Amino acid sequence: MAGYRADDDYDYLFKVVLIGDSGVGKSNLLSRFTRNEFSLESKSTIGVEFATRSLNVNEKVIKAQIWDTAGQERYRAITSAYYRGAVGALLVYDVTRHSTFENVERWLRELRDHTDPNIVVMLVGNKSDLRHLVAVQTEDAKSFAENESLYFMETSALESTNVENAFSEVLTQIYHVVSKKAMEAGEDSGNVPSKGEKIDVDVSAVKKTGCCSN
């Protein structure tokens, strides 16, 4: 079960990036998950931002270091440094703006150009609270996620719907990759990450199947 832990007490550190068009709610997803806060007056972030939160997964403490694109997406200026070392990603679109969903494919291509193609990726349809304004049908997004072997959820940072679930699922799947690699390494302790070590997972070693939930 997920829970808050002290920042300096963890077994693994996983870097997760938030990507997607400007204004889809990435910063509010980050603040809702890490601080349980939401701002209706959220302004575009300037400069690289990241926040952390620790969760319990299978009796291990996973510290998530979650990076926000910080407004750079407006200028197509996201650099390889932003993606470097990322083992998970939330690819966010706004369910009320179809253009943000149309751009998901480009974001995914850029992500895969800079990371392992089998990085754990969750497609996130944010602002699900605006039901009367929905422009992207759930089935369309789910179909895209299945075709690309992505996980999928619809969230509302405003109402805190599925925010916890989306981040937790990504972190749990990353942990499963790490656990599988550690088991395959056998008893050679030199191949098993030490406590507190930052993990850059070569997830290509594990064939991942897509999973969709709503």
UniProtKB/Swiss-Prot annotation:
Listed GO biological process terms: cell wall biogenesis; protein transport
Residues with lipid group (S-geranylgeranyl cysteine): 211-212
Keyword set includes Protein transport: yes
Motif Effector region, residue numbers: 42-50
Gene Ontology molecular function terms on file: GTP binding; GTPase activity
Membrane topology, as annotated: Lipid-anchor
Binding site for GTP: 20-27, 68-72, 126-129, 156-157
Gene3D superfamilies, sorted: P-loop containing nucleotide triphosphate hydrolases
Tissue expression profile of the protein: Expressed in the vesicle-rich apical dome of growing root hairs.
Localization, UniProt: Early endosome membrane; Golgi apparatus, trans-Golgi network membrane
Keywords (A to Z) from UniProt: Endosome, Golgi apparatus, GTP-binding, Lipoprotein, Membrane, Nucleotide-binding, Prenylation, Protein transport, Transport
Pfam families: Ras
SUPFAM superfamilies linked to this entry: P-loop containing nucleoside triphosphate hydrolases
A GO cellular component entry from the record: plasmodesma
Taxonomy, superkingdom: Eukaryota
Functional note: Intracellular vesicle trafficking and protein transport.
Membership in a protein family: Belongs to the small GTPase superfamily. Rab family.
Protein name, per record: Ras-related protein RABA1d
Lineage: Eukaryota, Viridiplantae, Streptophyta, Embryophyta, Tracheophyta
Gene: RABA1D
